[in-house]
Amino acid sequence: MNSIRTSVHDLRDEAVNLEEAVRSLVSDFTFCPVRFQYDAGRTVPRDVKYAFISISKEALSNIIRHSSATKASLTIREHPALYQLCIEDNGNMIRKNENGMGLAKMRDRVEKVGGNIHFFTENGFRILATIPKRRQDDETDTDR
């Protein structure tokens, strides 16, 4: 967990590579195996990167605190009109409050960048966040 906190502090760095940052969170996660898939380009807007890294950190933390999961997956995809983050686990329903503070923070972060987030509780727990792409002239931060 300390390395997860360190990764979040490193978010101040503008050259954060989304794939590497989330891969690091996943590799440091020892509660259960996590399958990580990344299918997004290297030109992801800075605010999208920060949102997805923060949500990934909170979701992995929630798996430890609220789940008896034996496996999880974390997928980041880029579609023609949006960026998508999906995190799911196969844990039992021991979550007491689907509207907890951590989930509220995730929702706030996604909504600040014009996106949506949904939580599903069938067959484990799933988080699906989508953030629409902006016009080409909007500021982006590439991972060089």
Summary of predicted features, one role per range:
Residues 3-17, 39:
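Flexible helix-coil linker/loop segments in the cytosolic histidine kinase module
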Residues 71-81, 88:
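Short beta-strand/loop element within the Bergerat-fold HATPase_c
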